[in-house]
Design a protein with these regions (language model features):
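Membrane-proximal helix-turn-helix segments that form the acceptor-binding/catalytic region
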Residues: 114, 121-125, 151-171
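Nucleotide-activated donor-binding/catalytic signature segment of Leloir-type glycosyltransferases, i.e.
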Residues: 258, 265-290
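Conserved acidic donor-binding segment of nucleotide-sugar-dependent glycosyltransferases
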Residues: 343, 347-355, 363-369
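Carbohydrate-associated surface elements
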Residues: 37, 177, 196-199
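Acidic anion/phosphate-binding donor-loop and adjacent secondary structure
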Residues: 29, 183-184, 191-192, 199-215, ...
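Nucleotide-sugar-dependent
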Residues: 233, 287-294, 301-324, 330-340
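N-terminal subdomain of nucleotide-sugar transferases
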Residues: 1-57
C-alpha cells in the first residue's frame, strides 16, 4: 500500500517522524514524504541545503519531495510567523509534483497546525482518508511560544485550528485527556480519535558509554535535559531550582542541557546574570543517535513544561526515551505527563513550582545510589509496558490505513 506523509520537519532535522517513516518502509509500505527544507531550530539552512533545494531526495527507502519555506532565522516573532505560514503555501503548490496513487495521507502535526492544510487539500481532491497525528494542540501551543494578546488574532487562530482538525477524517491523540479535548472541539465520534502514545527509537534503550563525556563530567551529579529549548519548557525556572538546590547542600548538582532552540540565548544570559558558573553546561545539539551517550552518564533525567493547562494534555515524546534509558526521571509539569512520571516511579512536581522542584532535586540527590537505581528500573519497566516501538508503529499503520 502507498502512503503520503506530510510534515514540515523531516530528516536531517531531528524529529520522530524520521523513524516512523523508516518503520513504515520496513513494514512494506510505499512511502512518499512532503516536507520542508531543513532549518530547525536555529533558522539556518543545514549544510548542503539552501532556498534552492535540493527538492528531491530519498531517505531509508522513502521518496522525499521538499517544498520551500521562509527560514525562522533568529527565532523572532516575525520570522517564526513567516515560517509558519510560508511552508503550507509552498507545500500546497508542490502537491502537483507528487506521483499519486496513495491509499492514505498521514500528517505528523507538530507546530504549526497549518502544516496539515496541504494534506487536507490532497486527501479531499483524491478522495482518500486523511489521518492527523496531533503532537502540538493549537492554538494553545502557539500561545506558549508567541505572546498573542490581540483578541481578534486569537479568535482567528482558534477558528482556523478547529476548522483544520474537523476536516481530518481521523485524529490521533497522545493521551486520553487530549482525545477528549479533540472530540469536544471537532464533534467526531470516539472511534475516529485514537489514543496512541509517542514511542521512541529502540536505540534509546541501549546503554552507550562515552569515555570522553564521562571523563568531562565526572565527579558531578548530572541532571540531563535533552531536546528543544523554548518558553514552553520553563528552563529558566529549572535553572533557578538547580541553583537553589546547590545552595541547600547539593553542591555538585550539575544541569547539562543537550539541545538548542529559541530560548537558548536567553538562558545563557540568565546563567551569567545568576553567576551559575559550572552549575550548568550548554552542550548544544547532537544527532538523535548520540543522545544515549548523555542519558547513560546521567544521574537523573529532567523533563519540564510551563504552567499551561493545555500543555498538560500531551505527553512529550522525550519521556519515552528517558524511561527507555532506565534512569530516574524528575519532572516539573502538569496533567498527563505528570501522571505518567508518577506511575513510573519518577519524581514529579507541578509545573513552574520552583520550590517543589528544588525539594525533589534534593531528595533525589540525597537518595542512596541503590534506591536511585531502583527508580531507574521502574522507569524502564514502564517503557517496556507502554512505549515499545513495534506495537505503537503497528497501531499507527492500522489506524491510518484502515481506521482500526
Amino acid at each position: 500500500m502507498r502512503i503520503l506523509v506530510v510534515t514540515q520537519h523531516f530528516w536531517p532535522e531531528n524529529f520522530r517522524i524520521n523513524d516512523i517513516v523508516e518503520g513504515f518502509v520496513q513494514d512494506g509500505l510505499d512511502v512518499d514524504v512532503l516536507c520542508g527544507l531543513p532549518n530547525y531550530p536555529k533558522g539556518e539552512w543545514f549544510p548542503g541545503y539552501s532556498e534552492n533545494g535540493p527538492f528531491d531526495e530519498t531517505y531509508k527507502g522513502a521518496q522525499i519531495f521538499r517544498a520551500r519555506e521562509i527560514p525562522r532565522k533568529g527565532n523572532t516573532g516575525k520570522t517564526i510567523f513567516l515560517n509558519y505560514v510560508s511552508w503550507p503555501l509552498y507545500a500546497a503548490a508542490a502537491l502537483k509534483r507528487l506521483p499519486g496513487g496513495y491509499d492514505a495521507v498521514f500528517c505528523f502535526n507538530t507546530s504549526p497546525v497549518l502544516m496539515c492544510w496541504p494534506a487536507i487539500k490532497y486527501a479531499k481532491k483524491h478522495k482518500i482518508p486523511f489521518t492527523n497525528y496531533v503532537l502540538d494542540l493549537w492554538p494553545e501551543n502557539l500561545y506558549s511560544v508567541l505572546p498573542v494578546k490581540n483578541h481578534f488574532m486569537r479568535w482567528v487562530a482558534q477558528t482556523v485550528s478547529d476548522s483544520l482538525y474537523k476536516r481530518a477524517d481521523r485524529l490521533i491523540a497522545m493521551s486520553e485527556p487530549l482525545q477528549k479535548r479533540l472530540i469536544a472541539r471537532t464533534g467526531k465520534p470516539e472511534k475516529d480519535v485514537a489514543v496512541i502514545s509517542q514511542y521512541c527509537e529502540d536505540f534509546y534503550a541501549v546503554p552507550c558509554p562515552d569515555p570522553d563525556l564521562q571523563a568531562r563530567f565526572a565527579g558531578r551529579f548530572n541532571l540531563v535535559f535533552t531536546g528543544t529549548m523554548t518558553p514552553a519548557q520553563s528552563l529558566d525556572m529549572v535553572l533557578r531550582a538547580v541553583l537553589d538546590a546547590r545552595a541547600a547542600g547539593a553542591e555538585d548538582l550539575h544541569l547539562l542541557l543537550v539541545g538548542d532552540g529559541m530560548s537558548r540565548e536567553a538562558l545563557q544570559a540568565l546563567a551569567e546574570e545568576l553567576h551559575a558558573g559550572d552549575a550548568v553546561t550548554f552542550y548544544g545539539s547532537v544527532p538523535a543517535e548520540k543522545v544515549p551517550s548523555f542519558t547513560t552518564l546521567a544521574d537523573a533525567l529532567l523533563i519540564s513544561l510551563s504552567d499551561s493547562p493545555d500543555l498538560g494534555l500531551t505527553v512529550p515524546g522525550k519521556l519515552a526515551s528517558y524511561m527507555a534509558a532506565g534512569k530516574p526521571v524528575i519532572a516539573s509539569m502538569n496533567g498527563a505527563g505528570y501522571e505518567a512520571v508518577k506511575e513510573s516511579g519518577g519524581l514529579a512536581s507541578p509545573a513552574c513550582d520552583q520550590a517543589a522542584l528544588t525539594q525533589n532535586l534534593l531528595a533525589l540527590y540525597r537518595m542512596p545510589a541503590a534506591d536511585r537505581a531502583a527508580l531507574g528500573a521502574r522507569s524502564k519497566a514502564y517503557y517496556e509496558a507502554h512505549y515499545r516501538r513495534a506495537e505503537l508503529l503497528r497501531r499507527l499503520e492500522s489506524f491510518t490505513l484502515r481506521g482500526e
